C-alpha cells in the first residue's frame, strides 16, 4: 500500500544536541499509525519538521506522491495535514461554527458574513463525524471531549487527508475516549490516515493498526500492532527490558500517622481511612468517583462540611491549601499545568515556590545561594533533565515537569504526600524513576497517598488500597487481597470481598 505521507531520513540538530537522526514515518490511507517513544525521543520535533515549524537539516517529505517542504503550519494545514494538539486551540466565547471557520468565514456578494452558510457547512462537518449537537452552541458550554471533536471538525474543514492526534485522550473520560475511537474509525472509513501519539499503550493496542517507534531521535522500527506485545514494545522504546516496572519496597509501615473519620465535602460523603508512617495508600476508582475531591478536602483546597482529621494524634483543620502545607500535608495535583506549575517561570522558581520560607532571612530577603544549592541537590536527586535551573519549566518534557512538581512538594518537608495521577502523560522510563523516588520516600518514613486511574500502578506500588464509588468508600484491601477484578468490582459499587471501613 502506498503511503499518503512519507518522511525519510529526517535529521534535525539544535546547538549541542541532535534531536532527530535519520528518522522516518509512514502514514497509510485508512490506517492509524501510532508514534511512540519516551519523552525526548523526537516525536514532537518530527511533527514540527513535518508542519514547517522547524526546517529539517536533511531528509525528504512526500505527501500524496509529491515531495513537499512546508514553510509553516498554515501551508501544511492548507495542503491537507491537520494536527490536533494536546492543548486545545479554541475560543470558548465563540460558537462551534465560528471556531471551525475562524479567519475563513463565508461571505455573501456584499462582503458580509453568510451566517446561514457557515452554520450549514459546520453542521455538515459535525454530521460527518456522527455528532448530533448544533454548530450554534458556544464552545465554552462543551465538555473537553466535545471540544476535541470540534478540533477534529476544524481539521476536516481543510479537507485533511492526514490527521495528527497528540495525546488525544489525556483529559478525556472513558466515555469520551470511546466516542473519540468511534470518530477515528469513521475517519478511517473515509480514507484518512491518522498519526496517534500517546503514552497509553493499552489504547495503542486497541485503536492503532501499526506502530512506529522512536528512541533518542532515531527510527527504531515500524511494526503491525498484531505482531507486537506490550513488553516487546516497551523494550523497543527504552532500549532495555523493564523487568520490574513497579519496584516495590518491602519495608513494613510504622504506626498510624493520619486518621480521617467521616470526612465530607463537595462530591465526598463520610469517608474514613488511615495512613501509616512509611506506607503507600493507593486510592482507586472510576472517573468522577470523588478521589480528587477527597484529597482536595483533606489538603484544604475544597471546603470540609463534616468529619475530622488527626495527624500524629492532633486535630487538623484545613480551610485553605496553606493550612494543609502548614500541617505537613502536600498535594501534587493531577493537572500540573493548571494547578501545579507556572510554565513561564524557571525550574528553580517552580521548585522552591512553596518553600521560600526556608530560604528567607527574618526580614524576608531571600538566601539565594542556599536556594540554589538546595534546588541543585533536588535536580540531581530527581534526575531532572534540564540544561540549567534557569530553564523555563514549560520547555521541559512531561516527565521532568512532574519530577519538579514532586520535588517542590518535598521541599516543604511534609509528613503526608498526596500524589494525584503522578505519572499521567509521563513516558515509561520516567515512570520507573518516579516509582523509585516514591519508594525512597516510603523508606524514609513519609506517608504517601497515591491516587491513580491505572490499576496496575495502584496494585504495583501500594501497601494497601481503598476504592471510591460515587463519593463513598466502597472497598479497603490489604495488598495481598487486592486484584484487578476485586478493585473494579468495588469501583462500580459491588462488594468483592472488600472490607468497608
From Swiss-Prot:
GO CC annotations, alphabetized: plasma membrane
Pfam families per record: ABC_tran
ABC transporter domain segment(s): 5-241, 252-495
Membrane topology note: Peripheral membrane protein
PROSITE patterns according to UniProt: ABC_TRANSPORTER_1, ABC_TRANSPORTER_2, RBSA
Highest taxon listed in the record's lineage: Bacteria
Keywords: ATP-binding, Cell inner membrane, Cell membrane, Membrane, Nucleotide-binding, Repeat, Sugar transport, Translocase, Transport
Entry's Gene Ontology molecular function annotations: ABC-type D-ribose transporter activity; ATP binding; ATP hydrolysis activity
EC number(s) on file: 7.5.2.7
Subcellular location: Cell inner membrane
Binding residues annotated for ATP, in chain numbering: 37-44
Catalyzed reaction equations: D-ribose(out) + ATP + H2O = D-ribose(in) + ADP + phosphate + H(+)
Listed InterPro entries: AAA+_ATPase, ABC_carbohydrate_import_ATPase, ABC_transporter-like_ATP-bd, ABC_transporter-like_CS, P-loop_NTPase
Main location: membrane
Entry similarity comment: Belongs to the ABC transporter superfamily. Ribose importer (TC 3.A.1.2.1) family.
Known role: Part of the ABC transporter complex RbsABC involved in ribose import. Responsible for energy coupling to the transport system.
Binding partners and assembly: The complex is composed of an ATP-binding protein (RbsA), two transmembrane proteins (RbsC) and a solute-binding protein (RbsB).
Protein name in UniProt: Ribose import ATP-binding protein RbsA
Native organism: Pectobacterium atrosepticum (strain SCRI 1043 / ATCC BAA-672) (Erwinia carotovora subsp. atroseptica)
Amino acid at each position: 500500500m502506498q503511503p499518503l505521507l512519507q518522511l525519510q531520513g529526517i535529521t534535525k540538530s539544535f546547538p549541542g544536541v541532535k534531536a532527530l537522526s535519520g528518522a522516518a514515518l509512514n502514514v497509510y490511507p485508512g490506517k492509524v499509525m501510532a508514534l511512540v517513544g519516551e519523552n525526548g525521543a523526537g516525536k514532537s520535533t518530527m511533527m514540527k519538521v513535518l508542519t514547517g515549524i522547524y526546517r529539517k537539516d536533511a531528509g525528504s517529505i512526500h505527501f500524496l506522491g509529491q515531495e513537499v517542504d512546508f514553510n509553516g503550519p498554515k501551508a501544511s494545514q492548507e495542503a491537507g495535514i491537520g494536527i490536533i494538539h494536546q492543548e486545545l486551540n479554541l475560543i470558548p466565547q465563540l460558537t462551534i461554527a465560528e471556531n471551525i471557520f475562524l479567519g475563513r468565514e463565508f461571505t455573501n456578494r456584499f462582503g458580509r458574513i453568510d451566517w446561514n452558510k457557515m452554520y450549514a457547512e459546520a453542521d455538515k462537518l459535525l454530521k460527518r463525524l456522527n455528532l448530533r449537537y448544533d454548530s450554534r452552541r458556544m464552545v465554552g458550554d462543551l465538555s473537553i471531549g466535545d471540544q476535541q471533536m470540534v478540533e477534529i471538525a476544524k481539521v476536516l474543514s481543510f479537507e485533511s487527508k492526514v490527521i495528527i492526534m497528540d495525546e488525544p485522550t489525556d483529559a478525556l473520560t472513558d466515555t469520551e475516549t470511546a466516542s473519540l475511537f468511534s470518530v477515528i474509525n469513521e475517519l478511517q472509513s473515509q480514507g484518512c490516515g491518522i498519526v496517534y501519539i500517546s503514552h497509553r499503550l493499552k489504547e495503542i493496542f486497541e485503536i492503532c493498526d501499526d506502530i512506529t517507534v522512536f528512541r533518542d531521535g532515531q527510527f527504531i522500527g515500524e511494526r503491525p500492532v498484531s505482531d507486537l506485545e506490550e513488553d516487546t514494545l516497551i523494550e523497543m522504546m527504552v532500549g532495555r527490558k523493564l523487568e520490574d516496572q513497579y519496584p516495590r519496597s518491602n519495608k513494613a509501615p510504622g504506626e498510624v500517622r493520619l486518621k480521617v473519620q467521616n470526612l465530607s465535602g463537595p462530591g465526598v460523603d463520610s469517608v474514613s481511612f488511615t495512613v501509616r508512617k512509611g506506607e503507600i495508600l493507593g486510592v482507586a476508582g472510576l472517573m468522577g468517583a470523588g478521589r480528587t475531591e477527597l484529597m482536595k478536602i483533606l489538603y484544604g483546597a475544597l471546603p470540609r462540611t463534616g468529619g475530622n482529621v488527626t495527624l500524629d494524634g492532633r486535630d487538623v483543620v484545613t480551610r485553605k491549601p496553606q493550612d494543609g502545607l502548614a500541617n505537613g500535608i502536600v498535594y501534587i495535583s493531577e493537572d500540573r499545568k493548571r494547578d501545579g506549575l507556572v510554565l513561564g517561570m524557571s525550574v528553580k522558581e517552580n521548585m522552591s515556590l512553596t518553600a521560600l520560607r526556608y530560604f528567607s532571612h527574618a526580614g524576608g530577603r531571600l538566601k539565594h545561594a542556599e536556594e540554589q544549592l538546595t534546588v541543585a541537590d533536588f535536580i540531581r536527586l530527581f534526575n531532572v533533565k534540564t540544561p540549567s535551573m534557569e530553564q523555563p519549566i514549560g520547555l521541559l518534557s512531561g516527565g521532568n515537569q512532574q519530577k519538579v512538581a514532586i520535588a517542590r512538594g518535598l521541599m516543604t518537608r511534609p509528613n503526608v504526600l498526596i500524589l494525584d495521577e503522578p505519572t499521567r502523560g509521563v513516558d515509561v522510563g520516567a515512570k520507573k524513576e518516579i516509582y523509585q523516588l516514591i519508594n525512597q520516600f516510603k523508606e524514609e518514613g513519609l506517608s504517601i497517598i497515591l491516587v491513580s486511574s491505572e490499576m496496575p500502578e495502584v496494585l504495583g506500588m501500594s501497601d494497601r488500597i481503598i476504592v471510591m464509588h460515587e463519593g463513598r468508600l466502597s472497598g479497603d484491601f490489604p495488598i495481598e487481597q487486592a486484584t484487578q477484578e476485586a478493585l473494579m468490582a468495588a469501583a462500580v459499587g459491588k462488594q468483592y470481598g472488600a472490607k468497608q471501613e
